[in-house]
Swiss-Prot record:
Catalytic EC class: transferase
InterPro entries in UniProt: Glyco_trans_19
Keywords: Glycosyltransferase, Lipid A biosynthesis, Lipid biosynthesis, Lipid metabolism, Transferase
Name of the protein: Lipid-A-disaccharide synthase
Organism placement in taxonomy: Bacteria, Pseudomonadati, Pseudomonadota, Gammaproteobacteria, Enterobacterales
Protein's gene: lpxB
EC number: 2.4.1.182
Record CDD domains: Glycosyltransferase_GTB-type
Organism: Klebsiella pneumoniae subsp. pneumoniae (strain ATCC 700721 / MGH 78578)
């Protein structure tokens, strides 16, 4: 009698965040089905969990139009090759992890061949280019969404979607230890502390750093002992920030950190940050915040017309109201930013209420996402 084939899951991750998700999913699946086989495009973490890498994840990790165009031929070749090889392999389920421009077309190709497909991490279709939802619906059997309002959006279009909670909410404690974070960063327990996070991209750091520094200078007038910490994602961004600081506030003492953004948020009484995942992480760190963001005028004009949501930051989208002050474009200037941060640093009613709401929102999206994703994969495999 022929030996029964083990459960076979094909996966494609296109960047580091996807590698983390893929590794967590593989771990949860292996705990239930130890002999399951995992193949596809994987980073080092997925490979460490036993995923066979037909291609290295770095092959897909290209950003920006110029880089994508330069690699387009190679990317199209990889996608065509994966379509063929997965078609021959006939995995029980294909899971495309994020990387929507690459994965959603691949999912569609495989679904046409009768292979069950999951897209893990919803693109921001609820915010802009909403018509993409129809292609996603045609290409996938199920979307796994991190956030409850994403599921509500897909439900409107009858696209199968499962809210699984957010892996970051699982990884972070409900009540972070502020004192321990300060000890790790060498910040005295008795002083007020402000974290500045001017973004992870070069363009953001260029646009925001000077105004963020001027804001901290204004706040120092009220709080002379204010400590300012600035976590920077890499050496390039640190160099860039140091140059801007030398031009803007050469005498101001700030503590620059290499990474350590999470510790900086937990240790701080308030944070000023660019929007993006940092705002969600800051919420989970229970650090009251103000979001400041600016882009080139034409980009902002275009975004205003394309973006369909009332807010840009995830805490506000989760709360369904302006929980966190958002100061965008012309409003993103030192006087306004300082005025918004002032009540948060005062450590009174405003920051306490924000802290409590952050905790409630954290509980709402803390659902053991790796396990839920594994449940979804196995349920689809059985159908």
């Amino acid at each position: 009698m022929a030996e029964q084939r083990p459960l076979t899951i094909a996966l494609v991750a296109g960047e580091t965040s996807g590698d983390i998700l893929g590794a967590g999913l593989i771990r949860a699946l292996k705990a239930r089905i130890p002999n399951a086989r995992f193949v596809g495009v994987a980073g080092p973490l997925m490979q460490a969990e036993g995923c066979e890498a037909w291609y290295e994840m770095e092959e897909l990790a290209v950003m920006g139009i110029v880089e994508v165009l330069g690699r387009l031929r190679r990317l199209l070749h990889i996608r065509a090759d994966l379509t063929r090889r997965f078609g021959e392999l006939r995995p029980d389920v294909f899971v495309g992890i994020d990387a929507p421009d690459f994965n959603i077309t691949l999912e569609g190709n495989l679904k046409k061949q009768g292979i069950k497909t999951i897209h893990y991490v919803s693109p921001s279709v609820w915010a802009w280019r909403q018509k993409r939802v129809f292609k996603i619906g045609r290409s996938t059997d199920l979307v796994l969404a991190f956030l409850p309002f994403e599921k509500a959006f897909y439900d409107k279009f009858n696209v199968p979607c499962r809210f699984i909670g957010h892996t970051m909410a699982d990884a972070m404690p409900l009540d972070p230890d502020k004192g321990a974070a300060r000890d790790r960063l060498g910040i005295p327990h008795s002083v007020r502390c402000l974290a500045l996070l001017p973004g992870s991209r070069g363009a953001e750091v260029e646009m925001l750093s000077a105004d963020f520094l001027k804001t901290a200078q204004l706040l120092r007038a009220t709080y002379p002992d204010l400590q300012v910490v600035v976590p920077l994602v890499n050496a390039k961004r640190r160099e860039q920030f140091e140059r801007i600081k030398a031009e803007t506030a050469p005498d101001m003492i700030v503590h620059m950190l290499d990474g350590q953004a999470r510790d900086a948020m937990i240790a701080s009484d308030a944070a000023l940050l660019a929007s993006g995942t940092a705002a969600l992480e800051c919420m989970l760190a229970k650090c009251p915040m103000v979001v400041g963001y600016r882009m080139k005028p034409f980009t902002f004009w275009l975004a205003k017309r394309l973006v369909k949501t009332d807010y840009v930051s995830l805490p506000n989208l989760l709360a369904g109201r302006e929980l966190v002050k958002e100061l965008l474009q012309d409003e993103c200037e030192p006087q306004a930013l300082a005025a918004a941060l002032q009540p948060l640093l005062a450590d009174g009613k405003t920051s306490h209420e924000m802290h409590e709401t952050f905790r409630a929102l954290h509980q709402q999206i803390r659902c053991n996402a790796d396990e839920q994703a594994a449940d979804a994969v196995l349920e689809l495999a059985k159908q």
